[in-house]
Amino acid sequence: MSARWTTAVLDPQTTGGWAVARSPEGFLVDANGALFPRDWLKRQELDVLCEHGIGHFDGQPVFLLELRTASEVQGCNWQGLRRFMLEGDFDTYKVLGYAAQIGTWAREHRFCGSCGQPMTQIHWERAMYCQPCDLRSYPRISPSMIVLITRGDEVLLARSPRFVTGVYSTLAGFAEPGESAEECLVREVREEVAIEVRNIQYVGSQCWPFPHSMMLGFHAEYAGGEIVMQPDEIEDAQWFSVHDLPPLPAGRSIARYLIDLYVARRLGLAEPVLPA
């Protein structure tokens, strides 16, 4: 969170404040951005599934209107979350990233996973509640490791078939039940490129709301083995010199930060700051 944006559980029964509207097509935006006067937004003909109070931006309360479908609003259009990450104000992206995670959770937890009965929204904590089961469901967070493997002035970068053409990045993967982040790192590296690592160093973390990952970032040194790419997961993987890198991930991502940080340290440059 930033000084401008703090999360909070707010009662939707209160009035006023700002609101964002999210549909399966993205967030509603106009020439001023994605934050709208809440009272005005609620007067539009929107197909609202639920409303959640999500925090404060510049001291003002912010609410999420999660929509069943996208509606036409004069002077507005729909924009995906990734575009906000790549462009514009990063603090606004943080608001929308949090809203997207809460909206996804609210949409997916309308019914109890145990008995199938409708769940009700609790306004004093971030939870959905099933009264027959006395079951509370909280927003999902999926821990994932992401690692830059280094070998002196070389870094190991790979690309997935899902990547933008030409872009190479670090290795990453979800933690399994019972694993530590370090154990996940070792396993994922073995699975994806079949090499061994040592001297695992935690660097930092970043929320990745696509849809609900918590990325735990590491540097690790190459310890042995030859690259063998995992079929269907890795399209190409190779060692690159810090002096001659391929196209890299977006500048606001932790993947890019891990790369830029190592390059800066090897070349004696000013270290970058991880976007929080």
UniProtKB/Swiss-Prot annotation:
Arranged from A to Z, the UniProt key words for this protein are:
Hydrolase, Magnesium, Manganese, Metal-binding, NAD, Zinc
Full protein name: NAD-capped RNA hydrolase NudC
Boundaries of each Nudix hydrolase domain copy? Answer: 139-262
Binding positions for a divalent metal cation 3? E188, E192, E233
Q: Which residues are listed for Zn(2+) binding in this entry? A: C112, C115, C130, C133
Tell me the function of this protein: mRNA decapping enzyme that specifically removes the nicotinamide adenine dinucleotide (NAD) cap from a subset of mRNAs by hydrolyzing the diphosphate linkage to produce nicotinamide mononucleotide (NMN) and 5' monophosphate mRNA. The NAD-cap is present at the 5'-end of some mRNAs and stabilizes RNA against 5'-processing. Has preference for mRNAs with a 5'-end purine. Catalyzes the hydrolysis of a broad range of dinucleotide pyrophosphates.
Under the heading HAMAP family, the entry gives: Nudix_NudC
Molecular function in Gene Ontology:
magnesium ion binding; manganese ion binding; NAD+ diphosphatase activity; NADH pyrophosphatase activity; RNA NAD-cap (NMN-forming) hydrolase activity; zinc ion binding
User: Per the record, what are the reactions this protein catalyses?
Assistant: a 5'-end NAD(+)-phospho-ribonucleoside in mRNA + H2O = a 5'-end phospho-adenosine-phospho-ribonucleoside in mRNA + beta-nicotinamide D-ribonucleotide + 2 H(+); NAD(+) + H2O = beta-nicotinamide D-ribonucleotide + AMP + 2 H(+); NADH + H2O = reduced beta-nicotinamide D-ribonucleotide + AMP + 2 H(+)
